[in-house]
């Protein structure tokens, strides 16, 4: 990571360092010119991740598609927004971890099984990652149409704990032309997992 994005990441780490009574020195750098032809990147933390994600979903239109790959999905406003997007005609595909295992421990499917049932009843396409003791640990949402794409990905699960300032999280938001490699790569990753193209 370079340029203004690197400075933004450093600033978030300085806040954490200060909170922990540590010190992360500031690096003096010159001004960076952003190349507006390239996708633009924004660093998001905690509640800003929630706000940007909700805006991404709520601003989606009939010609958009949203692909969501998530380890934990339970934040109520996001679930409601996904259902509303589907009702507006947005093509929506949700890929979830079955929450049967987490870091070597057996689990009971909470929260994803309940949310998947709710989404499925509303007509949203939902699939499970084929996990065999490991986790489908992706945390990515991608909105795209022929011209423009927007993606948010990083450390945050879509739960109240992760999105309402109860846990330290860092994501990035990437916005740009849909033909950019970053969006093609993200779409390819999602398609591979969605259709099990690597037979895993």
State what each model feature region is.
Residues 30, 34, 59, 149-151:
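Residue-level signal for well-ordered alpha-helical segments
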Residues 55-62:
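Conserved helix-loop functional segments at active or binding sites
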Residues 2-6, 62-65, 75-200:
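PLD/PLD-like phosphodiesterase catalytic module centered on the HKD motif
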Residues 1-55, 96-117, 191-200:
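Short, small/polar-rich loop/turn modules that mediate ligand/substrate recognition or access, typified
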